[in-house]
Amino acid sequence: PDLRDRIGKMLKGRREEYFLQGHLCTIWKDGQYKRTRQIDEVREGFEDMLQRLCTDSLEVGMIHYVDSLKDWKEVYEGPVMQYARELKAQGKIRHIGLSSHNPEAAMEAVKSREIEVLMFSINPCYDLQPAGENCEALWDDKNYKGDLVNMDPAREELYEMCSKQGVGITVMKAFGGGDLLSEELSPAGRALTPSQCIH
């Protein structure tokens, strides 16, 4: 919350200069942000964020962390998507977004035609990995031991689908939490440059 308070102070009198993207489905609990699908918590978390940011709207309301087809179905058919639609109709968010690490779940979301912005984990190493519901697998050294020479077809299909449908992509984990820039930690076996990571 402190970071949002500080950003809110900085935005005063300058809000129109910034494009804000914020998560739906996060709450502050036990000293950290956590994912929730409980609609009362989703509403409370979003209103708290607007208040702390000293604004009445965001450019993107990003539905947080949808990494399985089951979770996407629950979000899409349940009160979370309905709430996102309401926020958009009220002008509290301009675009509905979604964050994911799983190309299969992300593709289903993009196919709905309601997701206008996708936050997705993209970098030269993750792009070699197959779809999965466990995002921790993206960091697991054993998943980089085989011959990985081509982009995963599901990821490639997702990026092409977003391009064709005009869905914006915001990138997370471009440097893999810094691991890709480290010769010791990079799954590529050597340190990559920032330019290589932002392929």
Mark where each language-model region is.
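N-terminal small/glycine-rich loop or linker at the start of catalytic domains
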Residues: 21-33, 62-65, 171, 175-181
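N-terminal binding-site loop/beta-alpha segment at the start of enzyme catalytic domains
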Residues: 1-22, 56, 83, 89
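Short beta-strand segments at enzyme active-site cores
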Residues: 1, 21, 57-63, 97-98, ...
